[in-house]
């Protein structure tokens, strides 16, 4: 039986490109090489597509994917050169130009099956402000928030925020993930600085009420028949779960399943599945919840391309459900092929 070609796209133009490389390296090591032949393409920070490595068997522990430090100019290709009939693309890309609908649209133009959510759903989920408005319409509870758009009167925004929220608040670029550009503010001075920092990443800024809460996450897998995992908990050794804590300092651990009551578990899984359907997602997603000290549940974020390293919450949640990392990748490829056939059928 011939092997299925799996194309990994990694790197990318966003500030989350380092996470992308870590995720792609984990995938290339976990793949069942009796079933898959893996080709890899690096997208540089300036948007060039670079043909990197191919793997017909599991790479050695010391082998790394090529990145900015090791690529050669002659390896650059036209983006459309990644096309290969019958191949499935796994865009292991995070943040803008990765999970915002851009690469998804490109792959649909090429008529290639790809892992993950479609153009519209990716675009909606990438923008935290738009996501909140969609989830509000679906009746899913969220923390109170205000919005600042670049060019608006900043002093007025500060006054309006202080009128409806209380410190501390969290300031987030609308279009970034992995906690990039997010700050905690406990005064007007800190809020102003946090907004200015967030503006270096995006022109749309979300300001959320801080809550004393546990951080609980639920994994989602499927197309129209979405399934959810038991919730897992992010156990922090730091005050704020930022990019540094997540990926560099390793100052977090995970409890799977989370030590919460059955009622909260059921509610979170229901909210997660409802959110997945509300944005029209497919393939995979991860819903991040806050569980307040009063038992109140808030859906904080819906991530359509969650971190996919071997130590990331998403694959660990499914491993607890009995689906190994390699089996998870295989199922995502199957779901990608299923959605591709459905999309193509709709065009006939």
UniProtKB/Swiss-Prot annotation:
Binding-site residues, Mg(2+) 2: 301, 303
One MF term in the entry's GO annotations: D-alanine-D-alanine ligase activity
Pfam families: Dala_Dala_lig_C, Dala_Dala_lig_N
Cofactor binding notes: Binds 2 magnesium or manganese ions per subunit.
One of the GO biological process terms: cell wall organization
PROSITE patterns according to UniProt: ATP_GRASP, DALA_DALA_LIGASE_1, DALA_DALA_LIGASE_2
InterPro entries in the record: ATP-grasp, ATP_grasp_subdomain_1, D-Ala_lig_Van_CS, D_ala_D_ala, Dala_Dala_lig_C, Dala_Dala_lig_N, PreATP-grasp_dom_sf
Location in or out of the cell: Cytoplasm
Gene3D superfamilies: 3.40.50.20, ATP-grasp fold, A domain, ATP-grasp fold, B domain
Iron listed as a keyword: no
Pathway info: Cell wall biogenesis; peptidoglycan biosynthesis
Disulfide bonding pattern of the chain: none
Keywords assigned by UniProt, alphabetized: ATP-binding, Cell shape, Cell wall biogenesis/degradation, Cytoplasm, Ligase, Magnesium, Manganese, Metal-binding, Nucleotide-binding, Peptidoglycan synthesis
Cofactor annotation: Mg(2+); Mn(2+)
Catalytic activity: 2 D-alanine + ATP = D-alanyl-D-alanine + ADP + phosphate + H(+)
Domain ATP-grasp: start-end pairs: 132-334
EC number(s) given by UniProt: 6.3.2.4
Binding residues annotated for Mg(2+) 1, in chain numbering: 288, 301
Family: Belongs to the D-alanine--D-alanine ligase family.
HAMAP family in the record: Dala_Dala_lig
Function: Cell wall formation.
Entry-linked PANTHER family: D-ALANINE--D-ALANINE LIGASE, D-ALANINE--D-ALANINE LIGASE A
Full protein name: D-alanine--D-alanine ligase
Species whose genome carries this gene: Streptococcus equi subsp. equi (strain 4047)
Gene: ddl
């Amino acid at each position: 039986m011939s092997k299925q070609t799996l194309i990994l796209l990694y790197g990318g133009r966003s500030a989350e490109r380092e996470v992308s490389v870590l995720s792609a390296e984990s995938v290339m090591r976990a793949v069942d090489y009796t079933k898959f032949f893996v080709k890899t393409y690096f997208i540089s920070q300036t948007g060039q597509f670079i043909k990197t490595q191919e793997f017909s068997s599991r790479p050695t522990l010391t082998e790394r994917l090529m990145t900015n430090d090791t690529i050669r100019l002659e390896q650059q290709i036209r983006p459309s050169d990644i096309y290969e009939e019958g191949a499935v693309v796994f865009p292991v890309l995070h943040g803008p130009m990765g999970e915002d609908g851009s690469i998804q649209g490109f792959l649909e133009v090429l008529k290639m099956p790809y892992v993950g959510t479609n153009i519209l759903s990716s675009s909606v989920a990438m923008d935290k402000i738009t996501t909140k408005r969609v989830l509000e319409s679906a009746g899913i509870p969220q923390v109170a928030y205000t919005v600042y758009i670049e060019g608006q009167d900043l002093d007025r925004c500060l006054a309006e925020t202080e009128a409806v929220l209380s410190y501390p608040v969290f300031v987030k670029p609308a279009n970034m993930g992995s906690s990039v550009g997010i700050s905690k503010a406990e005064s007007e001075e800190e809020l102003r600085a946090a907004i200015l920092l967030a503006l270096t990443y995006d022109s749309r800024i979300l300001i959320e009420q801080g809550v004393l809460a546990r951080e609980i996450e639920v994994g989602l897998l499927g197309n129209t028949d979405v399934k959810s995992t038991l919730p897992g908990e992010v156990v922090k050794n730091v005050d704020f779960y930022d990019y540094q804590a997540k990926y560099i300092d390793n100052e977090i651990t995970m409890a799977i399943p989370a030590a919460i009551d059955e009622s909260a578990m059921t509610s979170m899984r229901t909210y997660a599945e409802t959110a997945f359907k509300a944005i029209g997602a497919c393939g995979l997603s991860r819903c991040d919840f806050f569980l307040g000290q009063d038992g109140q549940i808030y859906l904080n974020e819906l991530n359509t391309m969650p971190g996919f390293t071997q130590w990331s919450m998403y694959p660990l949640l499914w491993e607890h459900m009995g689906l190994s990392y390699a089996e998870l990748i295989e199922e995502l490829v199957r779901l990608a092929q299923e959605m591709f056939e459905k999309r193509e059928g709709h065009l006939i």
